[in-house]
Amino acid sequence: MKPRRHWWVWIFVGLYIWMIFRNSLMIAEASSALSAKVAYRLIAIINRYGFYIDFYTFHHYVRKLAHFAEFAGLGFLVTMAMHICPLFKSRFLNFVLFLIAIPAIDETIQQYVDGRSSQYFDMLIDGGGFLFGGLVCYVLVLIIKDLLFRKNRQEKTA
């Protein structure tokens, strides 16, 4: 049996998941204040260019984008960790386990936090972000492998 030398990459995945769960444990007021601060800064930038947006609508989209971005980062990290040291023989199982389990646990945590609620739509956004991050990582891995393959082939022919 082949020893798993690079298991430490999963520590980064675990720390990132902890960060996601920590954000979900914020009470509604703190979470809303944090995203409102981001929304105000973005609206100030957008207003400079002559576009005016309703704050409450924009704030809603900032919150949804935060869900997407959090899980895009997770998808990227999980895909990278899968390429380095898969947890299971099936890379598909590795990916799907995180794709389904982490958003479900995240939304379940929010059910028990003061002022927060669990929403299926957020799970879909989380899953979409995870898939996007995984796809970006996969494409980057393919590009890097292709560049290395070309470099090796050029060295052999020279």
Where are these regions (language model features)?
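"…centered on the first transmembrane helix and the immediately adjacent amphipathic helix/loop
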Residues: M1-A72, F76
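Membrane-spanning helices that line or support transport/gating and their immediate boundary helices
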Residues: A33, T108-Q111, I143-L147
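Membrane-embedded alpha-helical segments that form the functional core of polytopic membrane enzymes
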Residues: K89-I102
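Short, charged juxtamembrane terminal tails flanking transmembrane helices
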Residues: K151-A158
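Membrane-interface helix-boundary motifs at transmembrane edges
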Residues: K2-R5, M82-S90
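Alpha-helical transmembrane segments of multi-pass membrane proteins
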Residues: Y16-N23, L99-D106, G134
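Interfacial helix-loop-helix junctions of multi-pass membrane proteins
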Residues: P103-G127
